[in-house]
Each structure stands twice: as C-alpha cells, then as structure tokens.
C-alpha cells in the first residue's frame, strides 16, 4: 500500500510543491532555498522513512519566515492527504533522541487535533542563515496542517545545531511509529468515536 500525498501551494509570498510517500524508504529531494532547513527536512525524511520531495521558492529577499512557515504547512497538508481516513495507523508515538550532549523528547498523537507544546530554548539567534525563532514557526505550521498534537521538549543540550536537529529526528522517529499500519487493527480507525 502506498500512502501518497501531493500539495501545490502558491501565494504572493511563496510557491511550494510537496510530495510525501508515508510507505517510502526515506528518500528525499529537497530544495527550499534555505540550506539549514533543507538539512533538517532531509533528517525528517531519512529517519521517518517517509519519501519527501519539496521544491520551494519564496520572498527570501525580505526574510525566511514565509518560506519556512509555508513549507511546514505544505508538508503537513501532504501528510494529511496521504493518511486519507487515518485507518489502521498506530496513532500515538514518542521518541527520545540524543545528539552528542543534547537530549530531546517528542510525543505525538495523529488525531486530527492539532496542538503544539514547544519547550525548546536555543542559545543563538541564527543557525546558518535562519533565525532560530523560525523553527517554532515550522513545527507550529506542520502540526496545524497535519492535524497532529505535537509535544516537543529539549531536556538538555548546549549546541543549538544539535538541539534543533534532535528535534527533527525525534519527530521523524515518532512519525515512523505512529503512521505504521497496526497489523491487528488494519481496517479500523484508532478512536472510540469511529473517526479522527
């Protein structure tokens, strides 16, 4: 079974196309025009095993906010399309990911009830060309458009690159588990309500 979602999103600020394959192998082709964001999205694809294609063009002459946020929106929308009716998924997952001196914890509920808890403090204002405040914007946009409750907490760490990379990797590992088809519950929606 291939759960594939495609989204094209065009505004006066950005033009973005995204394709996800939840049942992929973690292959990616990513070009947002923002080097550090590309690196993080590569981690997301590789460690979730979700194939991810992203092509984004934005008003980066102003700043990177619109491209970062709209990329999160488009990836979330594509993921939600690929899930269709949420049938058979495990729904809940969590991961604790170390990266050298850093440890980050993520818990998710793929419930169509978007919410972000963000307990991450970065020690620098920029990583590469990105303002570090944009990472929260990306995760907020992603969780809202994907319909995912996302709790993200950096427990400790000193290096801001390691902290944010561990956030993307922990989300990736959580998605890998939560989006798997449960062999004991393949045809059922994981909710007593009967829908998500």
Swiss-Prot record:
Single annotated GO MF: imidazoleglycerol-phosphate dehydratase activity
InterPro entries attached to this UniProt entry: IGPD_sf, ImidazoleglycerolP_deHydtase, ImidazoleglycerP_deHydtase_CS, Ribosomal_Su5_D2-typ_SF
Reaction equation(s) it catalyzes: D-erythro-1-(imidazol-4-yl)glycerol 3-phosphate = 3-(imidazol-4-yl)-2-oxopropyl phosphate + H2O
Protein keywords: Amino-acid biosynthesis, Cytoplasm, Histidine biosynthesis, Lyase
CDD domains: IGPD (cd07914)
Name of one Pfam family that matches: IGPD
EC number: 4.2.1.19
Record keyword RNA-binding present: no
Gene3D superfamilies: Imidazole glycerol phosphate dehydratase, domain 1
Family: Belongs to the imidazoleglycerol-phosphate dehydratase family.
GO cellular component: cytoplasm
Membrane-spanning intervals of the chain: none
Domain of life: Bacteria
Pathway the protein acts in: Amino-acid biosynthesis; L-histidine biosynthesis; L-histidine from 5-phospho-alpha-D-ribose 1-diphosphate: step 6/9
Matches recorded under SUPFAM superfamilies: Ribosomal protein S5 domain 2-like (SSF54211)
One record GO biological process: L-histidine biosynthetic process
Name of the protein: Imidazoleglycerol-phosphate dehydratase
Compartment annotation: Cytoplasm
Source organism per UniProt: Pelagibacter ubique (strain HTCC1062)
Keyword set includes Amino-acid biosynthesis: yes
């Amino acid at each position: 079974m291939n759960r594939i979602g495609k989204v094209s999103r065009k505004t006066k600020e950005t033009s973005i196309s995204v394709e996800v394959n939840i049942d992929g192998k973690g292959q990616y082709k990513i070009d947002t025009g923002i080097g550090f964001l590309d690196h993080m999205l590569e981690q997301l694809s590789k460690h979730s095993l979700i194939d991810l294609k992203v092509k984004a063009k934005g008003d980066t002459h102003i700043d990177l906010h619109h491209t970062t946020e709209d990329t999160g929106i488009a990836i979330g929308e594509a993921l939600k399309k690929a899930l269709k009716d949420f049938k058979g998924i495990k729904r809940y997952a969590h991961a604790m990911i170390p990266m050298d001196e850093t440890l980050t914890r993520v818990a998710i509920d793929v419930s169509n009830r978007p919410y972000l808890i963000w307990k991450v403090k970065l020690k620098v204002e920029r990583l590469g060309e990105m303002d570090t405040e944009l990472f929260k914007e990306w995760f907020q946009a992603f969780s809202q458009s994907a319909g995912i409750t996302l709790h993200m907490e950096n427990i400790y760490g000193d290096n801001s690159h390691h902290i944010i990379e561990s956030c993307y990797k922990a989300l990736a590992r959580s998605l890998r588990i939560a989006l798997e088809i449960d062999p004991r519950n393949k045809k059922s929606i994981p909710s007593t309500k009967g829908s998500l």
